[in-house]
Amino acid sequence: TLSNGLARVRRNGKFGLIDITGREITPCNYQFIGQFSEGMAWIEADGLAGFINKKGRLTISCKYKWVSDFKNGLALVGTQDNTKGYININGLEYWGH
């Protein structure tokens, strides 16, 4: 489906993004690409999650066990050791104590 002028495509079991003209924005390198929220879409690569922007650039590295969509500038994230925290769209992490 088309979201923000981009469509998710799947080739050889991996996901990527194309624009409305069919031009590749992100190669099919990801296990999954979520919907865009606040200009960011979560992705999964090698079992870990991160985020790309609408230009298809990896903006937050795939280092989290799980992530949520961005809402009000923050996304909830979880680490391999089950620590939960938040990140902003620049990747700045906020961890609870």
Predicted regions and their residues:
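Residue-level detector of conserved, function-critical positions
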Residues: 1-97
